[in-house]
Amino acid sequence: MEKQWTSGLFSCMEDSETACLTCFCPCVTFGRIADISDEGRTGCGRCGVFYGLICCVVGLPCLFSCTYRTKIRSKFGLPESPTSDCVTHFFCECCALCQEHRELKTRGLDPSIGWSGNMQRTMAPPMSQQMMG
């Protein structure tokens, strides 16, 4: 049974900070999503720069970004909706990036601190407690 996205494709303003960042600098949002989706193997900066190059040279960043939507869907068992991943990114690039970013945040992963930051946060040793006497 497929789970559902935790927010709609057009619910960008549920996280206005990410919506503004994505509107003016989608390469940063994409880099963050890619870093989490690839579990830190590719890095935010590298993917963000590659996204920017595709944007400038080809003009179709959706050719690259839709593959990360597929990764997120596979990881969390989400439906390919409202249309295929490539069509969603082609027509609604910023909305798709915002939805993916929100999905990661809702599932406990903070894209703004990257994969390694999330792993450090998850695996942080407990604070030592001392008795006051």
UniProtKB/Swiss-Prot annotation:
It holds the Pfam family PLAC8. It is a single-pass membrane protein. It is found in: Membrane. The chain crosses the membrane at residues 49-68. One of its GO terms (cellular component) is membrane. The keyword Ribonucleoprotein does not apply. It comes from the Eukaryota. Keywords: Membrane, Transmembrane, Transmembrane helix. The keyword Ligase does not apply. May be involved in heavy metals transport. Belongs to the cornifelin family. PANTHER family: DUF614 FAMILY PROTEIN-RELATED (PTHR15907). This is Protein PLANT CADMIUM RESISTANCE 7. The lineage of its organism: Eukaryota, Viridiplantae, Streptophyta, Embryophyta, Tracheophyta.
